[in-house]
From Swiss-Prot:
GO terms for molecular function: ribosomal small subunit binding. The keyword Coiled coil does not apply. One of several proteins that assist in the late maturation steps of the functional core of the 30S ribosomal subunit. Associates with free 30S ribosomal subunits (but not with 30S subunits that are part of 70S ribosomes or polysomes). Required for efficient processing of 16S rRNA. May interact with the 5'-terminal helix region of 16S rRNA. This is Ribosome-binding factor A. The gene is rbfA.
Length: 118
C-alpha cells in the first residue's frame, strides 16, 4: 500500500508544479518549486513541501497565497488524477535545501582551514 501512496505523491508533485506555475494568478505566489509530496497511506492527506525564491516576507506571502488557493488546487488535482477522494492538501516549507547549503558552506570552511594548516 505504501507503494501506491508514493506513486500518487509523485504524480501530485508533477501536477502541482504545473498548476502552481501556470494556473494560479495570485501575485503573492512567486517562484515556487514543489520539492516533495508526502501522502498518507490511506491517501486522505497530502503534505506538499515547497521551496520559494526570495526573503522571509516573500515566503510568508507565498504560503498565504497558496493557502487561499488550496480549494482550487485540490479541485485541479481531482480533475487530473483519478482517485475516489482527492487528498486534503497542506503546504510546508522544505528546509532541507537550506540545511544542505549550510552544510556545504561549513565543509568548504573546514577544507580551507585544513589547507592553511598544511
Amino acid at each position: 500500500m505504501k507503494l501506491r501512496a508514493n506513486r500518487v505523491g509523485e504524480q501530485m508533485k508533477k501536477e502541482l508544479g504545473d498548476i502552481i506555475s501556470r494556473k494560479i494568478k495570485d501575485p503573492r505566489v512567486g517562484f515556487v518549486t514543489v520539492t516533495d509530496v508526502q501522502v498518507s497511506r490511506d491517501l486522505q492527506i497530502a503534505t506538499v513541501y515547497i521551496s520559494v525564491l526570495g526573503d522571509e516576507e516573500q515566503k510568508e506571502n507565498t504560503l498565504k497565497g497558496l493557502a487561499k488557493a488550496k480549494g482550487f488546487i485540490r479541485s485541479e488535482i481531482g480533475q487530473r488524477i483519478r482517485l475516489r477522494k482527492t487528498p486534503e492538501i497542506s503546504f510546508e516549507f522544505d528546509e532541507s535545501i537550506g540545511y544542505g547549503h549550510r552544510i556545504d558552506t561549513l565543509l568548504h570552511e573546514i577544507n580551507k582551514e585544513g589547507k592553511r594548516e598544511e
